[in-house]
Amino acid sequence: MSLTAAVFLACFVTGLGLALFRNPIYGLYTYIAVFYLDAPNRWWGEGLPDLRWSLLTAGVTAIAMLRLKPDPDRVPWHKTAPAVFFIAYTLWLWIQSPWALDPEMHRECAIQFTKFIIVYWMVYRLIDTPVLSADFLLAHVLGSFYLGLLAFTSNVSGRLDGVGGPGIDDSNTLGMH
């Protein structure tokens, strides 16, 4: 295992431990790190165990969030306009799955939107102050900087396929991100 992989693994375990025993926000930060670093597809991640890193992070964060008491002054997450839209659209995707023209791509899309709902729930429940919003946005900026650094140092001419992480590994979705 490379030194980079060992550091990633140590930070991953630390982030999940902090999420469970201190504050679930660390699980969300770990999720962002796993998304942007995309360890299984990097040269330094070859020695890491074959895990569903994002799923494990989301599961641990969800378990850690169970101890949070709902804020009586906030609208429940599922009653916000974006959540209603996401839920309705995702349900519609699953309903129309049997007659989709490209069942495999349609299934991937439905799964992706289901994941968006879970991440939306986590972000809505955990990011509740301006300081946490700034920290969350900073984590995204740092992740985007890392992807930009990978793109800049890659030996790819033309389209940047394979530079991004999970779900953004082709040049079109990476560009949208």
Regions found by a protein language model. Give the residues of each.
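Residue-level micro-sites within transmembrane alpha helices that shape
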Residues: 37, 51, 95, 111-114, ...
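Membrane-interface segments at transmembrane-helix junctions in multi-pass inner-membrane proteins
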Residues: 42, 108-110, 125, 131, ...
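Transmembrane alpha-helical segments
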Residues: 115-123, 145
